[in-house]
Structures are given as structure tokens and as C-alpha cells.
């Protein structure tokens, strides 16, 4: 398919060529109706998005082979509980353990338009979900004599608000240099035929890639460099509402 005539705006040809590789040229159908700022926003989004994700999702499903993983049964935990605890504490003292908090959600179902972790659950005093989680980490830090690196996954919707909330509350007493924010990746939203939706004439529809994407999101935002630089070997991953 040839590129339509009259499109001389910088970046259009590159965007069209990229979309053509994935059969997504329809995303430029309203280009002539956009102002310069909207055109720039659309072209930038097209440049940033990995459309191969959509192509991969269109592949026929293959039956997987599920192999049971080894488990530690309750009887063994009761017998070796002290041993396991001491091993964990040793790794913490050595600085080998980091924490990953999945906090990309908003408090909509709680009746709040703030990040879910900023919800006040206190009865007699203010007590925030983030505060409870930080208190748990402070307890660990006190026992092992050092802070644990905390990686907080936010989303495009609540990143700025989450950072501001922590700053406003002075990180609830936690060392700010041990707290690292990164945003959750998004993926283009498509119909059953693999065609990506337009949310607006100048903006593609995207949605978060789910909690399962925490590792790739960490990698994209350079968090794994911090992990390696600090000798972290274990990551404890938990959600803000669990």
C-alpha cells in the first residue's frame, strides 16, 4: 500500500510505515483533521508503542504443559520455621532482599479519586494504606539494622499523585533514597481482529498490562540497574490492597 499524497509533516512517513507493518494504518485516518499539537501527540504515541504485542496476541493459542512446582508443606514449616526465619533475616541483613509494591490502582471502589494506597482507613486517627505498608517495612528495617529498597509501581493515572502523597507525608519516616517509583507499562487496546482502537482522533486507546507486567516495567524504567547495583537477589512482590 502506498503512502497517501500530501503528507509532508515530519514523522508521518515513519509512523505510516510502522503501522503498515502491523496492518494498523487506520490509526492515521483522522490525521488531516488534527491541529499541530494533536498530530505531534499522535505521532509520538505511535512511535512509542510496541505493536508486536498485538500481533503476538493474535497467534493461535497453544496448549501449555503445566509442571507442578515444589511446595513446602505446613508440617515442614512448623518443624523448620526457625530455620527459615533465620535464613530470611540473614538475607535481609546482607541487603539481598528488595520489596516491590504494586500500587497502580485508584481508590474508585472505595469512593475516592486518589491513589488506592492514599485511602484513609483510620477510625480514631488518620491511617493510610501506604502508611500501614511502610510501617511494616520500618519494623523490618529496625530488626535488621538497615532499610530495604522499596520499588513502587504506579500507573499513568496516579504516578504524580502517589509521588506527591509520599513527599507530603515525608515517606512516613522511611528513607526516601530507598524508595523508587516506576510506572506500569500500557499496551494498545484492540478488537477481536487485532485492530487497535482510537480513544480520540489523536490518541490511541491503551490499558495497563496488568500486575504480571511488573518485571518488564521495572526493566523498562531502569529499576533492575538499582537491583543489580545494590546486590539484591530476592524481590518480595505484594499488592497495595492485599
Please state what every model-predicted region is.
Residues 1-17:
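Basic/polar N-terminal segments that are highly enriched at the extreme N-terminus
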Residues 6-10, 21, 109, 197:
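Generic signal for short, ordered secondary-structure residues
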Residues 16, 98-100:
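Exposed boundary/loop context
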Residues 16-79:
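Low-complexity, highly charged intrinsically disordered N-terminal segments
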Residues 25, 74-98, 112-242:
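Domain-scale recognition of functional cores that engage charged ligands
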Residues 103-109:
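Conserved adenylation A10 loop of the ANL superfamily
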